[in-house]
């Protein structure tokens, strides 16, 4: 009898092998063409989280349909807003497995999901849009929610 899979397991291709780069490259490019910085290693993730002054947005990109038709187009629309995060970065679930695991380490209290979008300040999540909040919405609705989050968390220092 096999053991149940961990909740932290990320979707992969071919019995745990990461998705082939030629398969995910166009999906990566949708975000990098917007100026989104790729975080391909755990060290890249750590550097972004600890080295960003202001708000950091980390997108957990994915091969799924809701990433293609909803999350990435919603992000593209939201990034047209005049107020946005100081740094926008991405990891790719199922491709950059270790980098994605490291990003999820910083998302304490949230279940692993892809796609998902986190806004962080001082190494802590201040806003999270999870897959369950993406998959039944359109890109305009996602963009609207993201721009509201940008206005709240990126426009001025957060006071607690």
Task: Map each language-model feature to its residues.
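Typically the conserved alpha-helix immediately C-terminal to a functionally engaged Cys/Sec
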Residues: 68-81
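Short, charge-rich binding segments
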Residues: 80-82, 107-111, 118
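Thiol-based oxidoreductase modules, predominantly thioredoxin-like and allied folds used
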Residues: 60, 83-102
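Structural signal for conserved beta-strand scaffold positions within catalytic alpha/beta enzyme cores
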Residues: 40, 90-92, 119
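Short active-site neighborhood of thiol/selenol oxidoreductases, capturing the structured segment around
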Residues: 52-64
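N-terminal leader/targeting and pre-domain segments
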Residues: 2-54, 154-158
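Short acidic (Asp/Glu) patches
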Residues: 97-114
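Non-catalytic, surface beta->alpha helical segment in thiol-disulfide oxidoreductase systems
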Residues: 111-158
């Amino acid at each position: 009898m096999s053991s149940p899979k961990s909740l932290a397991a990320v979707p992969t291709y071919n019995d745990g092998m990461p998705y082939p780069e030629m398969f995910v490259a166009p999906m990566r490019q949708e975000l990098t063409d917007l100026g989104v910085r790729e975080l391909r290693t755990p060290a890249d993730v750590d550097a972004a989280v600890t080295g960003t002054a202001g708000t950091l947005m980390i997108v957990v990109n994915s091969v799924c349909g809701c990433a293609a038709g909803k999350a990435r187009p919603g992000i593209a629309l939201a990034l047209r807003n005049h107020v946005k995060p100081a740094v926008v970065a991405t990891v790719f679930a199922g491709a950059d497995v270790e980098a994605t695991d490291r990003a999820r380490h910083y998302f304490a209290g949230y279940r692993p999901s892809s796609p998902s979008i986190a806004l962080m300040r001082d190494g802590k999540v201040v806003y999270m849009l999870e897959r369950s909040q993406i998959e039944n919405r359109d890109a305009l609705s996602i963009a609207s929610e993201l721009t509201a989050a940008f206005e709240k968390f990126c426009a001025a220092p957060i006071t607690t």
